[in-house]
Amino acid sequence: MAKIIRIKGEILGKDEPMVFTKEYNVVKEDDALETMYSEMGSKHSVKRAYINVLEVSEISEEDVQSPILKKTLEMY
């Protein structure tokens, strides 16, 4: 069964860390982490060592904040 995982973290940069929150609908928590590392590294040209994960939590459908994920969940 799929879970909704919220990942909070920061990307270390030259000036201040960039804080982010990402939400994924995945089967395993590890899949969410791998997808997040891949997306953030690709978009921001940063290596995984510069991405700090601060919190990983499973959330309910009602707690989803991402508009794209909300629309996806409404389709099912």
UniProtKB/Swiss-Prot annotation:
Pfam families on file: Ribosomal_L18A (PF01775)
Top-level taxon of the source organism: Archaea
Keyword field contains Transmembrane: no
Cystine pairs: none
Annotated family: Belongs to the eukaryotic ribosomal protein eL20 family.
Database matches in NCBIfam families: PRK00773.1-1 (NF001981)
Quaternary context: Part of the 50S ribosomal subunit. Binds 23S rRNA.
Protein name: Large ribosomal subunit protein eL20
